[in-house]
């Protein structure tokens, strides 16, 4: 069982919801990425999604696009991100880490070389935004052979055929994009999310994490009521951008603690 699978199994056994924060590797300060990853884990993150900076992040809204640009301007590459994960693993062998990014940096390295390097670094999952599932069976197998979960996106516009395709090749969890648009958008529709999850669950035997548009404890709790996990990205990137350097890690931990408490209150209020 992979680290991601055992994390979700433990959450399910406790009746808890998963909390998956996203941050861009190298932003705001490449020297502090590992420190911020530990701050997320300390706050109660179940899985950490680490964004690999890319020059044309088409699925991302302005907050994460600009974050990616800042990291690239500081020279952060896929190899730097893998080195950060390896350093994180020196003192945390429990929290799963998922790399989220685009195909180009992986293809430049080569899928086999990337799988080997990611395994060596202690990466648990990979989500390549621009790999459609119907063209990704070989990539998924290469990742699985290295013990890495290939994670895929589904959206409100995903057909039953695409959902079934993801069900065949994905592992770990699936990431449901709750809005038609880009990350960080504001209009969250929990009813439409609740309406789509059963169609995914019937075809994909994996936990469903929902992201895009979750900004605070209230929206996180509302989405977690109808899903297995919530993914929060733009708000975290914004928080790190705005915080004074000396208080950034503490603010990050406190923000994650707030979300964690909101998720853990689901079901608790019934008694």
From Swiss-Prot:
One of its GO terms (cellular component) is cytosol. It catalyses: (1S,2R)-1-C-(indol-3-yl)glycerol 3-phosphate + L-serine = D-glyceraldehyde 3-phosphate + L-tryptophan + H2O. It holds the Pfam family Trp_syntA. Keywords: Amino-acid biosynthesis, Aromatic amino acid biosynthesis, Lyase, Tryptophan biosynthesis. Its EC number is 4.2.1.20. The active site is at 49 (proton acceptor), 60 (proton acceptor). InterPro entries: Aldolase_TIM, RibuloseP-bd_barrel, Trp_synthase_alpha_AS, Trp_synthase_suA. One of its GO terms (molecular function) is tryptophan synthase activity. Pathway: Amino-acid biosynthesis; L-tryptophan biosynthesis; L-tryptophan from chorismate: step 5/5. Tetramer of two alpha and two beta chains. The alpha subunit is responsible for the aldol cleavage of indoleglycerol phosphate to indole and glyceraldehyde 3-phosphate. HAMAP family: Trp_synth_alpha (MF_00131). Belongs to the TrpA family. This is Tryptophan synthase alpha chain. It comes from Paraburkholderia phymatum (strain DSM 17167 / CIP 108236 / LMG 21445 / STM815) (Burkholderia phymatum). The gene is trpA.
């Amino acid at each position: 069982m992979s680290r991601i699978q055992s994390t979700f199994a433990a959450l399910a056994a406790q009746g808890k919801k998963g909390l998956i924060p996203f941050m861009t590797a190298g932003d705001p300060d490449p020297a502090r990425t590992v420190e911020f990853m530990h701050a997320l884990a300390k706050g109660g993150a179940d899985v950490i999604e680490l964004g690999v900076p890319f020059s044309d992040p088409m699925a991302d809204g302005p907050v994460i696009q600009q974050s990616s640009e800042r990291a690239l301007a500081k020279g952060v590459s896929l190899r730097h991100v893998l080195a950060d994960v390896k350093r994180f693993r020196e003192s945390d062998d429990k929290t799963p880490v998922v790399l989220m990014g685009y195909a180009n940096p992986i293809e430049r390295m080569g899928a086999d070389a990337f799988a080997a390097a990611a395994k060596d670094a202690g990466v648990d999952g990979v989500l390549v935004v621009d790999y459609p599932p119907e063209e990704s069976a070989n990539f998924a197998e290469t990742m699985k052979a290295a013990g890495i979960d290939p994670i895929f996106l589904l959206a409100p516009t995903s057909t039953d055929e695409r959902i079934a395709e993801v069900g065949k090749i994905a592992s770990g969890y699936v990431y449901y994009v709750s809005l038609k648009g880009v990350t960080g958008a504001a209009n969250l529709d929990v009813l439409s999310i609740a309406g789509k999850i059963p169609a995914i669950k019937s075809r994909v035997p994996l936990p469903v994490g929902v992201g895009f548009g979750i900004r605070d404890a209230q929206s996180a709790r509302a989405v977690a009521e109808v899903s297995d996990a919530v993914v929060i990205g733009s708000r975290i990137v914004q928080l790190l951008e705005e915080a004074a350097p000396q208080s950034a890690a503490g603010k990050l931990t406190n923000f994650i603690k707030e979300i964690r408490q909101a998720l853990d209150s689901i079901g608790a209020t019934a008694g």
